[in-house]
Amino acid sequence: MSTFLDFSSISGGGDGGSGGSCSVRAFHGDHGLSTFQSSCAVRLNSCSGDERFMSNISSQDVINSQPQQAGSYQSPGTLSITYSAHPSYGTQSFCTGYNHYALNQDVESSVSFPQCGPLVYSGNISSTVVQHRHHRHGYSSGNVHLHGQFQYGSATYGNSSDQANLTFVAGCSNPLSPLHVPHHDACCSPLSDGVPTGQTFDWMKVKRNPPKTGKAGEYGFGGQPNTVRTNFSTKQLTELEKEFHFNKYLTRARRVEIAASLQLNETQVKIWFQNRRMKQKKREKEGLLPKSLSEQKDGLEKTEDASEKSPSAPSTPSPSPTVEAYSSN
């Protein structure tokens, strides 16, 4: 957008401070909008110590002599900015009128004022202007963020005719302040930049089913669950087979005695007898081995008991002696 600005002269002030007023007329040719006028009053007072530089901008719409384009509107707004400045100048206030142009249009303006005093400051200012919502031509305006940069050139002291260079550049197209851009980039960074993929943790290195090893006790390995299989010697197997031949089931006292004599623990002897009984039953079921003598004896005893309990041949009952009844005369 092209803008033409026409400035008038500035009147000087007294010795204690310098001040002036100027009128600005701007022509906006590209948008076809009517011209507007704005008055500017600049006051500079000498001061000492740490002070703050207050800039108040208040605007009031000027009724256009020509009709606006469709979609353009005007709304009043107030901008208040406070920031630290050089202690060589005091408070400055100026007023200007401005228009809101059609939507989706970038507005850039550059206003220069004659130098009025020694101004040494350069800094970034971001401000937010909350405007009233307007419903005109089907458009509504919400919060508008203005982000600009004030630049002041340094100058030496002089008479009241010295001029100050004030430049204000405002851009409305930037949605974020320059101070917030690094924070926004850090928040919106992709997840791939964070924790690296394929990272292994300590809990991933733990084995779920580690192999367990048996501990050697007083008589061989300790009888703990999931222990390594015990390898019996030939002498131990011979003694266990002899005992199993006579007694398939051991009492607690006999089991402790055999474990002590064979240098085994009680649990090993107990498990060996359990496995030996299961092996014997499996072989008998397959018909590889005849029934043991004990079972045969048990079968004979059962048959004898059954024969004894079977009913014998019925014996003829002996005739009972008849008793004659004596009749009494």
Curated annotation (Swiss-Prot):
It is found in: Nucleus. InterPro entries: HD, HD_metazoa, Homeobox_CS, Homeodomain-like_sf, HXA1/B1/D1. PROSITE patterns: HOMEOBOX_1, HOMEOBOX_2. The keyword Transport does not apply. A motif (Antp-type hexapeptide) lies at residues 200-205. Residues 208-227, 277-329 are annotated as: Disordered. GO terms for biological process: regulation of transcription by RNA polymerase II; ventriculo bulbo valve morphogenesis. Residues 283-308 have a biased composition (Basic and acidic residues). One of its GO terms (cellular component) is nucleus. Belongs to the Antp homeobox family. Labial subfamily. Sequence-specific transcription factor. Part of a developmental regulatory system that provides cells with specific positional identities on the anterior-posterior axis. This is Homeobox protein Hox-A1a.
